[in-house]
Amino acid sequence: MSNASLSWLTKLNTSETPDKVLRRSSIIGTIGPKTNNVDVLVKLRKAGLNIVRMNFSHGSYEYHQSVIDNAKQSEEIYKGRPLAIALDTKGPEIRTGTTIDDKDYPILPNHEMIFTTDEAYAKKCDDKVMFIDYKNITKVIEAGKIIYIDDGVVSFEVLQIVDDKTLKVRSVNSGKICSHKGVNLPGTDVDLPALSEKDKADIKFGVKNGVHMIFASFIRTGDDIKEIRKVLGEEGKDIQIIAKIENQQGVNNFDEILVETDGVMVARGDLGIEIPAPQVFVVQKQLIAKCNLAAKPVICATQMLESMTYNPRPTRAEVSDVGNAILDGADCVMLSGETAKGNYPFEAVSMMHNTAIIAEKAIAYQPLHNEIRSLANRPTPTTETCAMASVSAAYEQDAKAIVVLSTSGFTSRLVSKYKPNVPVMMVTRNHRAARYCHLYRGVYPFVYEKKTVDNWQEDVENRLRWAVSEAIDLGIIKKGDSIVTIQGWTRGSGHSNTVRVVQA
């Protein structure tokens, strides 16, 4: 593999241009004050945006409702590919209290003070006593451990656990004691609930408004995912849950989380505070690889093109970061402040689009397909066997596309797992599935609007002919090209068992 990889890399086209090429990965953009506008959303979609992210750490329900409404209106103006909407929860968190008169108190290194969970100090914090709103902090932390305040801007070492409400700490560096700052406990297992009351209300808002996915913050165990499913209920059962891995517990318990979740986000911001920064890229690679083998979509997020918040061009390191996330196997890459508050949102999406396309063309797909196939657990279920066979057939036949006649998107996800080097056209009547299939690398939704006919095989042929016609019109394939198709033997999801090779 290494020799084949080296040989492949030496033959890359270094003059590759991204013009008029289908991008396999998807782009997620956070919508904020700079971009919450119908015309702006249309322009972002034309630049390559696939999934709208709403950050529920900020904004009112009225504001988020306007994002949803504007996103839907943008589709009425510009059809393009269906747009998915994601709700990113605030998540359970630990914060400091309120300082006296809301002042900032400067401190120097080696400054000793008290951290307390005593509510009497919740609004009386200063440079002597700071309230922490996590009641069990004295039970879970140990002397010698570090506490980060304000995303690690200020660090404290725990000197002594004085009693069940009090810690004696010493500052590691200079900084300021301020109101309502986030608190991180790196290397310490915490027992916070999976969802705060705000999160539960936010998720119910999302269910009511038909969001397509939940980005669930600070997931620590598989049980956290189960709790979110309970809140989603029957009405929200089709909403995809994406587990954000942001702490050491999430990394340690990743295998059980992966079983329960629909997908994963490698959320490198808080993760880089909770674990040493040099370890983040190793965790990123491991988590993405595990997701690829499990056929679970994975998103790489945080600071990908951050300098483009205020600059029209990214740093070279940022471009490499985006490209390497694609090479690692990420299905989606995400923009945060770049599109939420940045001065160059269109340029950021366009830069990510172009970088992703070029990175995708640097991948040796067939050796990757062969490796994933060799690692599959045997015997494979029928649908996965068909998905695997369709990709192998596409390589053997030099097919130009794989057409999946799909109800739920499940088969398309499995086809994506086996890394085809051609587009996967998911033909479906299911509008929701067409939107969340953006999570799967290389899968393109084609919504078939015509009603079903009684004869099943006739309905299959109608959808296939329509898909071929659409693909030819879009320039994805040419008449006479070989294509591989997957279909079921009967109506409904979970019945895919037929693979064919046909001519366009």
Curated annotation (Swiss-Prot):
Mg(2+) binds at E246, D270. K(+) binds at N55, S57, D88, T89. It catalyses: pyruvate + ATP = phosphoenolpyruvate + ADP + H(+). GO terms for molecular function: ATP binding; kinase activity; magnesium ion binding; potassium ion binding; pyruvate kinase activity. The record marks K244 as: Transition state stabilizer. Transmembrane segments: none annotated. It is an enzyme of class 2 (transferase). Its EC number is 2.7.1.40. Pathway: Carbohydrate degradation; glycolysis; pyruvate from D-glyceraldehyde 3-phosphate: step 5/5. Homotetramer. Belongs to the pyruvate kinase family. This is Pyruvate kinase. It comes from Debaryomyces hansenii (strain ATCC 36239 / CBS 767 / BCRC 21394 / JCM 1990 / NBRC 0083 / IGC 2968).
